[in-house]
Amino acid sequence: MRVTIFGSGYVGLVTGACLADAGNDVICVDIDAGKTERLRRGEVPIHEPGLEALIKRNGEAGRLEFTTDAVRGVEHGLFQLIAVGTPAGEDGSADLRHVLTVARTIGTHMNRYCIVITKSTAPVGTADKVHAELDRTLTARGAKVEFDVVSNPEFLKEGAAIGDFMKPDRVVIGTDNPRTTELMRALYEPFTRNHDRLIVMDIRSAELTKYAANAMLATKISFMNELANIAERVGADIEKVRIGIGSDPRIGYSFIYPGTGFGGSCFPKDVRALIRSAHEAGHEPQVLNAVDSVNARQKEVLFRKMQRHFADGLKGRTIALWGLAFKPNTDDMREAPSRTLIELLLKAGAHIQAYDPVAGAEAQRLYAGVAGFTLAKNAYDAARGADALAIVTEWQEFRSPDFERLRELLKSPVIFDGRNLYDPAMVSRFGLTYYAIGRGKLLAAA
């Protein structure tokens, strides 16, 4: 089938590559000529395991093409997917300008039936706005062209997006048209052949489902971080508590790991957008407000622990940071806890020696020329001569370090573990002072 995707960002690239790999004829349209040309050369602008090979294979097979020619894109696809950004406005609401611009573009050039699909994360009512924009544009042309608008939210995890798309746990389709349902079912049939994962619902419910899913996961994270802070004050160990509650099948173990808060392009933005939508609907979302505020404070937790440890201040201290991306297996630093910690440390007059196995280039882009910030070549170079080591992202290579070597490299043998990677008793045997999240009497409450 013929598919056009507007937007060659994270969602657009993964969606386009996976659909092409299933045999579809896919064109990705983007207004960024430089990015488009780099993609044609096989240069993928994001780090996502397996994506570069997938793009290369399908590009060489002629099933995946990148262009800036929107007219050609509209003429090409039966399915017109909108996968452009919906950045947060100052009030937390999702900015739909890019989405509606694409809708106008499609309406300006469409001459036959097509299905316009909103993949971008957008608030309830967005599909209605897209439909109205298409109607207005077609009316202005004096054209009568049939179309349908579908909400088809994505549920991709950065670092595991290819697997999520190829073997989805669900495919949500928001539509009220039986014909459209069958066409969407045919599009996703290669990915749901063994188990029918297609869930069809009305458009507004589909739009809310995406926000509800991310808000629920964010709530679990903030709740666990709140419990971790309580555990520190009452002398309990949150890791034992986690095992105790996770063994209950009604709770489970996913997303109940305490840490330095959630970041990335989705959870923070989507929680705030849902709060804004609730306000617009005349409802005060108290739980969501708490999720957001707890997360903002949790991003400062390692800094507060450092302040307590270094009673004479952080000015002039050198802090090693392990991990800059908001999670492992990505180079995404948007709203990452590391950025909050970096800003607080620099403001306090500290120097930073940072290392991330993938996000180094992104960190260089963000902090190039910033006094006091240095990127190290590897984890041990970052630790060399530092007054303390802070672990912010739980990359696999950080899980079993040489603690004896760390003790020798660090100016003062202190570790602030924001991801609870290590056994406190084992670390202490190497003569290292160890601070973690919610580990009871192991550290003063922050």
Placement of each model-derived feature along the sequence:
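Structural/interface elements that position substrates and couple domains in central-metabolism enzymes
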Residues: 1-446
